[in-house]
Curated annotation (Swiss-Prot):
GO CC annotation: plasma membrane
The protein, known as: UDP-N-acetylglucosamine--N-acetylmuramyl-(pentapeptide) pyrophosphoryl-undecaprenol N-acetylglucosamine transferase
Species in which this protein is naturally found: Actinobacillus pleuropneumoniae serotype 5b (strain L20)
The entry's keywords: Cell cycle, Cell division, Cell inner membrane, Cell membrane, Cell shape, Cell wall biogenesis/degradation, Glycosyltransferase, Membrane, Peptidoglycan synthesis, Transferase
GO molecular function terms noted in the UniProt entry: UDP-N-acetyl-D-glucosamine:N-acetylmuramoyl-L-alanyl-D-glutamyl-meso-2,6-diaminopimelyl-D-alanyl-D-alanine-diphosphoundecaprenol 4-beta-N-acetylglucosaminlytransferase activity; undecaprenyldiphospho-muramoylpentapeptide beta-N-acetylglucosaminyltransferase activity
One family name in Pfam for this protein: Glyco_tran_28_C
Physiological role: Cell wall formation. Catalyzes the transfer of a GlcNAc subunit on undecaprenyl-pyrophosphoryl-MurNAc-pentapeptide (lipid intermediate I) to form undecaprenyl-pyrophosphoryl-MurNAc-(pentapeptide)GlcNAc (lipid intermediate II).
Keyword Cytoplasm on entry: no
Principal location listed in the UniProt entry: membrane
Length: 351
């Protein structure tokens, strides 16, 4: 009979996409996969599109909620644990994988109550609160970066297979001249500071660059017009084929979510990171993984002005060899076997 895995991951692409990569790896080995998520977050649409059945529990975050919600929280968590327990009893998985998001908390507790091994994977350089709690009851804890947990195995972040299959950067970059292709990513929501600053700089860079700018939903206004006027860029709300976009790019300007950092390493690209200003400096610490190795440059959000960006870009645009060096260093930090390693640990720990 096929072994069964229940995947708990939700809320953002940073949790869901790495979990899908692990699910794919286990499906290749004959495992049956089911997902635990919430109806109002992205996994509800995304996971079924990948052919994986999904079950739902009711749970939401408490950050920024009023006192009433905090008082009701224990009851909401208890209810969610009972819902997850019922799903686990019916499905009878051999292991449960927690990849982050609100759903992991009740799901992990329910798995422990049912005697099912819990394996955790932390994608960020700073562990999320749910994973900190669950690490105390998990059979194994894995992490993408060495800073989240003191004694957990570092495996990297599972990324899409097509990125690892891109040619080495020194081969991709060998015959390229000008313009320098700059991929700008504002994220699915769009990062206002990136969307405002980069088009201003495009006006001053002329034909030395061509910019492909992903602005996020509803953010084309103003950006598109600037690129039409400058003639050195295009803007779109979303990019459908990320592997093709990474293959085309010579340089990336973006936020430094954990998945983005690991995708850029897998593709082998130099980057300028503008970390989102989390209280725990999560994105900044993610970015240092590549910046400390000479593969990326970090510009803090408060410093990300047109003039600062221009000062950073001009020497890079003038020196293709430098871009290639940074790209090679980025590829050296990639973890192409992350999904396989997480799958191996699940197989080892399954009951």
């Amino acid at each position: 009979m096929a072994k069964k895995l229940l995947v708990m991951a939700g809320g953002t692409g940073g949790h869901v996409f790495p979990a899908i990569a692990v699910a794919r790896e286990l499906q290749k080995q004959g495992w049956e996969i089911r997902w635990l998520g919430t109806k109002d977050r992205m996994e509800a649409d995304l996971v079924p599109k990948h052919g994986i059945p999904i079950e739902f529990i009711q749970i939401s975050g408490l950050k920024g909620k009023g006192i009433g919600a905090l008082l009701k929280a224990p009851f909401a968590i208890f209810k969610a644990v009972m819902q997850a327990r019922k799903i686990i009893k019916n499905y009878q998985p051999d292991a449960v994988l927690g990849m982050g998001g609100y759903v992991s908390g009740p799901g992990g507790i329910a798995a422990k109550l049912c005697g099912v091994p819990v394996i955790l994977h932390e994608q960020n350089a700073v562990a999320g609160l749910t994973n900190v709690w669950l690490s105390k009851i998990a059979r194994r804890v894995l992490q993408a970066f060495p800073t989240a947990f003191p004694n957990a195995e570092v495996v990297g972040n599972p990324v899409r297979e097509d990125l690892a299959q891109l040619e080495a950067p020194e081969i991709r970059f060998a015959e390229r001249g000008y313009p320098i292709n700059i991929l700008v990513m504002g994220g699915s929501q769009g990062a206002r500071v990136i969307n405002q600053t980069v088009p201003e700089v495009a006006k001053q860079l002329g034909n030395n660059v061509f910019i492909s700018h992903q602005v996020g939903k509803g953010n084309l206004g103003g950006v598109e017009e600037i690129y039409q006027a400058t003639g050195n860029g295009i803007a779109a709300e979303f990019i459908d084929d990320m592997a093709q976009a990474y293959s085309w790019a010579d340089l990336v300007i973006c936020r430094s979510g954990a998945l983005t950092v690991c995708e850029i390493a897998a593709a082998g690209l130099p980057a300028i990171f503008v970390p989102y200003q989390h209280k725990d400096r999560q994105q900044y610490l993610n970015a240092t993984y590549l910046a400390d190795g000479g593969a990326a440059i970090i510009i803090e959000q408060q410093d990300f002005t047109p003039q600062t960006l221009l000062n950073v870009l001009q020497p890079l645009i003038a020196d293709r060899r430098k871009l290639t060096e940074m790209a090679v260093k980025a590829r050296a930090k990639a973890t192409p076997t992350a999904a396989q390693r997480v799958a191996e640990v699940i197989i080892e720990q399954a009951k």
